[in-house]
């Protein structure tokens, strides 16, 4: 297994059984529990060509090692679209092997291919492990996010 190369590819329907435990672990990390309907809708959007919501997985052979979700959207600050990297998760057993970096680079390539002006993402200020990776691959613009429940 270790000799097989890790590939980052668009998620496929047959990846669901491996994706779902990671998706739930990701929610646990952020102390949220999304309704099942949200998860089902999200999964369906990945395969709907009319939706600008995407998922890619890092795989070694048939084993999923992590995922990235991203959204292409309009901006009032540019004529071209932006790409928002919404979720990134790598299995704890394979962290430190540059899989997160490879998932980000995959999204970067997709954003360039779709002529996006910017790739951006958020993380918890206490997620220092992820910030080490993010500081390595991108710049921190000093933006503070505010949320208003609707």
Where are these regions (language model features)?
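Conserved GNAT-fold acetyl-CoA-binding loop/helix
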Residues: 20-45
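A short beta-loop-alpha structural element at the N-terminal edge
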Residues: 6-21
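A conserved beta-turn-beta hairpin within the catalytic core of GNAT-like acetyltransferases
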Residues: 73-85, 95, 142
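A short helix-loop-beta-strand connector motif used in the catalytic cores of GNAT acetyltransferases and
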Residues: 45-57, 84
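Conserved acetyl-CoA pyrophosphate-binding loop and the N-cap/start of the following alpha-helix
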Residues: 94, 98-106
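Conserved active-site alpha-helix within GNAT-family acetyltransferase domains
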Residues: 101, 125-144, 148
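Conserved GNAT acetyl-CoA-binding A-motif
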Residues: 112-122
């Amino acid at each position: 297994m270790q000799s097989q190369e890790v590939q980052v590819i668009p998620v496929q329907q047959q990846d669901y059984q491996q994706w779902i435990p990671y998706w739930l672990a990701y929610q646990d990390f952020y102390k949220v529990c999304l309704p099942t309907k949200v998860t089902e809708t999200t999964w369906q959007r990945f395969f709907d060509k009319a939706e600008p919501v995407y998922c890619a997985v890092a795989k070694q052979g048939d084993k999923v090692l992590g995922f990235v979700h991203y959204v292409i959207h309009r901006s009032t600050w540019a004529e071209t679209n932006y790409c928002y990297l919404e979720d990134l998760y790598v299995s704890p057993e394979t962290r430190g092997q540059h899989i997160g970096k490879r998932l980000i680079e995959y999204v970067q390539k997709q954003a360039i291919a779709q002529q996006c002006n910017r790739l951006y993402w958020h993380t918890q200020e206490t997620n220092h492990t992820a910030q080490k990776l993010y500081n390595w691959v991108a710049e921190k613009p000093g933006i503070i996010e505010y949320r208003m429940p609707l």
